[in-house]
Amino acid sequence: MIALIQRVTRASVTVEDEVTGEIGLGLLVLLGVEKEDDEQKANRLCERVLGYRIFSDADGKMNLNVQQAGGSVLVVSQFTLAADTERGMRPSFSGGAAPDRAQALYEYFVERCRQQAINTQTGRFAADMQVELVNDGPVTFWLQV
């Protein structure tokens, strides 16, 4: 399971001219689900995402996690993160989970975030989405479990 996380001052996702999720300060989490992923991996990735200390403390040091910074999380499904890009000029998506399994794990990940008392907004699974964000820093990390 893969999370591309970006520290943002604001982010939103729109589907068919409807804003489905919007946050201020926090993390935009682009989530990719791979074939071998399960709930245990989702738990571990959620723990890492929410615990990752990439917000500045009073001394300007990256030392706070999203909850300590008073932030929110916007989770957007992105199957392209599971692409194999090693060869050729066209990505292969054979490493991605089947759509039903990917959706179940995406929803599980979102629910785990919400259980941690963090405001968690979402896109819409498998929809054509427009994501807007202001990346603060820029600060972007690839987390994989």
UniProtKB/Swiss-Prot annotation:
Alphabetized SUPFAM superfamilies for the sequence: DTD-like
One function term, GO molecular function aspect: Ser(Gly)-tRNA(Ala) hydrolase activity
GO cellular component, one term: cytoplasm
Entry annotated with the keyword Protein transport: no
Keyword match Disulfide bond: no
Highest taxon of the lineage: Bacteria
CDD domains xrefs: Dtyr_deacylase (cd00563)
Primary site of residence: cytoplasm
GO BP annotations, alphabetical order: D-amino acid catabolic process
Locations listed in the record: Cytoplasm
Keyword annotations of the record: Cytoplasm, Hydrolase, RNA-binding, tRNA-binding
Domain text: A Gly-cisPro motif from one monomer fits into the active site of the other monomer to allow specific chiral rejection of L-amino acids.
Its job: An aminoacyl-tRNA editing enzyme that deacylates mischarged D-aminoacyl-tRNAs. Also deacylates mischarged glycyl-tRNA(Ala), protecting cells against glycine mischarging by AlaRS. Acts via tRNA-based rather than protein-based catalysis; rejects L-amino acids rather than detecting D-amino acids in the active site. By recycling D-aminoacyl-tRNA to D-amino acids and free tRNA molecules, this enzyme counteracts the toxicity associated with the formation of D-aminoacyl-tRNA entities in vivo and helps enforce protein L-homochirality.
Name of the protein in its database record: D-aminoacyl-tRNA deacylase
Protein species of origin: Salmonella paratyphi C (strain RKS4594)
Gene that specifies this protein: dtd
